[in-house]
UniProtKB/Swiss-Prot annotation:
Biological process, per Gene Ontology: intracellular protein transmembrane transport; protein import; protein targeting; protein transport by the Sec complex
Organism: Streptomyces griseus subsp. griseus (strain JCM 4626 / CBS 651.72 / NBRC 13350 / KCC S-0626 / ISP 5235)
Transmembrane segments: none
Catalytic activity: ATP + H2O + cellular proteinSide 1 = ADP + phosphate + cellular proteinSide 2
Protein name: Protein translocase subunit SecA
Source species, domain of life: Bacteria
Lyase listed as a keyword: no
Subcellular localization: Cell membrane; Cytoplasm
MF GO annotations: ATP binding; protein-exporting ATPase activity
Gene name linked to the record: secA
Pfam families on file: P-loop_SecA, SecA_DEAD, SecA_PP_bind, SecA_SW
Length: 939
């Protein structure tokens, strides 16, 4: 254990003693609640709310509130919270991550802090890993809250904004991290206050917190719209790289020359093109220099094509189904619908496989899960495996981790690892072990790391005549059924890593599923034959329960569930999750991992040292070794990978912190505009700042006689219908020498304010305020989108600054700040220009159309329902809005991959674009001329 982890655990005993005291306190008053009627129990909720309003803290109310929930759960669900569950609930309320083993009833624990914190009336969010669990928990645990008079909502995909608003309005809301995150982003793309759905971020309880806050933290949530991208290059480069050969890196010091056209580093998952490869590519493409700025995007296409060829393996990293490349999750082995790699990687794989290449998208709004969860005033979470990541929870989220004791002692026997020289020998031993255990009837769960390996093992088992079920990416329709029955006598289940988190494997089987299967066999359906189903269910359930009870005792005597891992995962946590499937609630169980030197983890780390040990010992292929040195090497390899992944996540956070501060400014500004704040004063400041900026650019050097005032006035005329002339200023100052920058500024500012008042008198104040609101929102959104694109581009190349002995992060912060300032100047300049140059007409009713690109004279259209005056800007006809908005988010247990899909039309926010002929403001053009980089193509 590292020194840091020891320090992290130093205060553990103190916290556990405090939690024990709370649990004892709740138990001591339990009897007071038993004799209350349902109505009296329900009335306590209002009493607690009043006491909170009168100044009592939630901590003061905790013992009574917890005792109330315990009694309600007994009456509604027939389940009483154990004392250890009370401890877990208290840990969550205090803002800790509670580590509770599989089968300890984490879902029931969530009801305690949810009820207590909902008494404040500010809302509680319970966050799960998928829609199925969110709906299941909100329905089941929601019964307890509803019984106590609280409202319960559930956010799932494809809900309309009105439905979402209603769910967020509830006291307690269940949903997935992606849904909560996207609603936050969409709220910050809304065009009127009426479109907002969330009501703040008060308290969140995150179920499977390690999966959501650790595994998924490297992948941001992104809302995007279609971008212009040439897909032909993907196909061209896919063909081209088949003619390039893989080689090794050179080393000048050792006199080793590089070989082949490119090299691949599997450990870091990177590729590098050699000089020979560059020469071939330049020759085939007919270009002089691949690394010229005009050819920059081609380097990205080339790197992706090589990665697709060398690092992404079919049937391990992805499968091709119906002409579509589907990513296989490396943790769970499941296909997640719509999941795609970003940065053009998915398109490169599509080109390699010769299927249709789908378009890339442009980012409209983005946030990492790390920063989203840091928005909450109080955050807590629960999981079966958190201690290995305690340092990360503390450093990034300021969350302590508390291991909650189990209700019954854990009696699972964790056997030591067996290591074989070859993979074939390892799988032969695995099959022997399974056949032996299966013969006596012990249920077995086998964990593999890929679809390919699960199918190979399945073939070997079939040859031996062992009946088994396969649970992998190609089988996930039957997932819940297979998992539920994996604890039955003689069951053999082969699972790609452990999919199906949130479903317990009960020894002897699951009576609910058995009863349902029995009724379906009789031809009944819960939807079509509601009454018959309801009538037949109790009897079927009773029969199933008796059968399960008898089988449970048999399986228990056989040693419980045997978990067999066929490979160590790069994260100890995933291994522990697989092990944790066995030995729930004090049941017996056993686990063992079989390894070989061909396993990915061993191949990438320490394999040579282990190979040496085996060679020296002269061990035959089919004889395993149990060697402490080898076991230590594996543990060291795992901690290296974990540390590497932690550093990556910390790095993502450091860079996102820069964008996060900018996001807070922009979203704060948007919210002020949406909430109807009078922008008149702000627009006056915009005008003054823009005029000052124009004048500063033209008068920064030389004397008045040398200034190009004609050019300056030309710029003013583009901005607004300027009335004051250079001659008038010269006359007022006496001569040209008397015309100072301050004098020009004062005169032009007075003029622009007069012109603006005149325009307001023509249109009317109400119309002008509404026009200001729409213009500022429109410009703000478009400039922010362009800024995100620029920041993306900046981050991609910033690592190269290290070669110039500069800190990439410091450079990113500095340049990001400059770009943000240029964007803010651009927002002011464009807003003023639009307010003067848009032709506006008032209409009784107007169709909802978004703002779109114009040329010299942009057009502004109404978007979103609002009670403000209905106006329409006359100008060029607006092009069509993009058909859809796209989303991209981390997968459940995903590393590197993303779930992608399209929002339903009523979920999407309008795309608002307008701009000058080259799409740049003067501020941005000046920045580009200085070499600060204007708009650039993204690699």
């Amino acid at each position: 254990m590292s020194v840091f982890n020891k320090l992290m655990r130093a205060g553990e005993g103190k916290i556990l003693r405090k939690l024990h005291r709370i649990a004892d306190q709740v138990s001591s008053i339990e009897e007071d609640f038993v004799n209350l009627s349902d109505a009296e129990l329900r009335a306590l909720t209002d009493e607690y709310k009043e006491r909170y309003a009168d100044g009592e803290s939630l901590d003061d109310l905790l013992p009574e509130a917890f005792a109330t929930v315990r009694e309600a759960a007994k009456r509604v669900l027939g389940q009483r919270h154990y004392d250890v569950q009370m401890m877990g609930g208290a840990a969550l309320h205090l803002g800790y991550v509670a580590e509770m083993k599989t089968g300890e009833g984490k879902t029931l624990v969530g009801t305690l802090p949810a009820y207590l914190n909902a008494l404040s009336g500010k809302g509680v969010h319970l966050i799960t890993v998928n829609d199925y669990l969110a709906e299941r928990d909100s329905e089941l645990m929601g019964r307890v809250h509803k019984f106590l008079g609280l409202s319960v909502g559930c956010i799932v995909a494809n809900m309309t904004p009105a439905q979402r608003r209603e769910q967020y309005g509830c006291d307690i809301t269940y949903g997935t991290n992606n849904e909560f995150g996207f609603d936050y982003l969409r709220d910050n793309m809304a065009w009127s206050k009426d479109e907002l759905v969330q009501r703040g971020h008060n308290f969140a309880v995150v179920d499977e917190v390690d999966s959501i806050l650790v595994d998924e933290a490297r992948t941001p949530l992104i809302i995007s719209g279609p971008a212009d991208q040439a897909t032909k290059w993907y196909g061209d480069f896919a063909k081209l790289v088949t003619r390039l050969t893989k080689g090794e890196a050179g080393n000048q010091l050792k006199g080793i020359e590089e070989t082949g056209d490119y090299e691949v580093d599997e450990k870091k998952r990177t590729v590098a093109i050699h000089e020979a490869g560059v020469a071939k590519v330049e020759d085939w493409l007919g270009i002089d220099n691949l690394y010229e700025s005009v050819n920059t995007p081609l380097v990205g296409y080339l790197n992706n094509a090589i990665k697709a060829k060398e690092l992404f393996k079919k049937d391990k990293d992805y499968v091709v189904i119906d002409g579509e490349v589907m990513i296989v999750d490396e943790h769970t082995g499941r296909i997640l619908a719509g999941r795609r790699y970003n940065e053009g990687m998915h398109q490169a794989i599509e080109a390699k496989e010769g299927v249709d290449i789908k378009d890339e998208n442009q980012t409209l709004a983005t946030i990492t899960l790390q920063n989203f969860f840091r928005l909450y005033d109080k955050l807590s979470g629960m999981t079966g495996t958190a201690m290995t990541e305690a340092a990360e929870f503390h450093q990034i989220y300021k969350l302590g981790v508390v291991p909650i004791p189990t209700n019954r002692p854990m009696v699972r026997a964790d056997q030591s690892d067996l290591i074989y020289r070859t993979e074939v020998a390892k799988f032969a031993a695995v099959v022997d072990d399974i056949a032996e255990k299966h013969e006596k009837g012990q249920p077995i769960l086998v964990g593999t790391t890929s679809v390919e390996k699960s199918e190979y093992l399945s073939q070997q088992l079939s040859k031996r005549g062992v009946q088994h079920e396969v649970l992998n990416a190609k089988q996930h329709d039957r997932e819940a059924t297979i998992v539920a029955q994996a604890g039955r006598k003689g069951a053999v289940t082969v699972a790609t890593n452990m999919a199906g988190r949130g479903t317990d494997i009960k020894l002897g089987g699951n009576p609910d599923d058995l009863a349902e299967a029995e009724l379906r066999q009789r031809g009944l359906d819960p939807v079509e034959n509601v009454e018959e189903w309801a009538a037949a269910l109790p009897a079927a359930l009773e029969t199933a329960e008796q059968a399960v009870k008898a089988e449970f005792e048999e399986v228990k005597d056989l040693g419980g569930l045997y978990v067999l891992g066929t490979e160590r995962h790069e994260s100890r946590r995933i291994d522990n999750q697989l092990r944790g499937r066995s030995g729930r609630q004090g049941d017996p169980g056993e686990s063992r991992f079989y390894l070989s030197l061909g396993d990915d983890l061993m191949r990438l780390f320490k394999a040579q040292m282990v190979e040496r040990v085996m060679s020296m010992a002269n061990v035959p292929d089919d004889v395993p070794i149990e060697n402490k040195m080898v076991t230590r090497a594996i543990a060291s390899a795992q901690s290296q990978v974990e540390q590497q992944n932690f550093e990556t996540r910390k790095n993502v956070l450091k860079y996102d912190e820069v964008l996060n501060r900018q996001r807070e400014v922009i979203y704060g500004e948007r919210r002020r505009v949406l909430e109807g704040e009078d922008l008149q004063e702000q627009i006056r400041h915009f005008m003054d700042d823009t005029i000052d900026d124009y004048i500063r650019q033209e008068t920064a050097e030389g004397f008045a006689e040398e200034w190009d005032l004609d050019r300056l006035w030309g710029a003013f005329k583009q901005l607004y219908p300027v009335k004051v002339t250079v001659d008038e200023l010269e006359e007022a100052a006496g001569d040209l020498a008397g015309v100072t920058a301050e004098f020009i500024a004062e005169s032009v500012k007075n003029d622009i304010h007069e012109q603006y008042e005149e325009r307001e008198n023509t249109l009317g104040s109400d119309i002008m305020r509404e026009l200001e609101r729409r213009v500022v929102l429109s410009v703000l959104d478009r400039k922010w989108r362009e800024h995100l694109y620029e920041m993306d581009y900046l981050q991609e190349g910033i690592g190269l600054r290290a070669m110039a002995q500069k800190d990439p992060l410091v450079e990113y912060q500095r340049e990001g700040f400059d770009m943000f300032n240029a964007m803010m100047e651009g927002i002011k300049e464009e807003s003023v220009g639009y307010l003067f140059n848009l032709e506006v007409q008032v209409e009784q009713q107007v169709e909802e159309v978004p703002v779109q690109d114009g040329a010299e004279r942009p057009s502004l259209e109404k978007e979103g329902a609002t009670a403000a005056p209905q106006i329409r800007a006359k100008g060029l006809e607006a092009p069509q809005r993009p058909d859809r908005l796209h989303f991209s988010a981390p997968t459940v247990d995903g590393e590197g991959g993303v779930v992608e899909g399209d929002f339903a039309n009523d979920e999407a926010t309008g795309d608002t674009r307008s701009g000058s002929a080259d799409g740049m403001t003067r501020a941005e053009r000046r920045k580009a001329q200085k070499g600060g980089g204007g708009r650039r193509r993204k690699k």
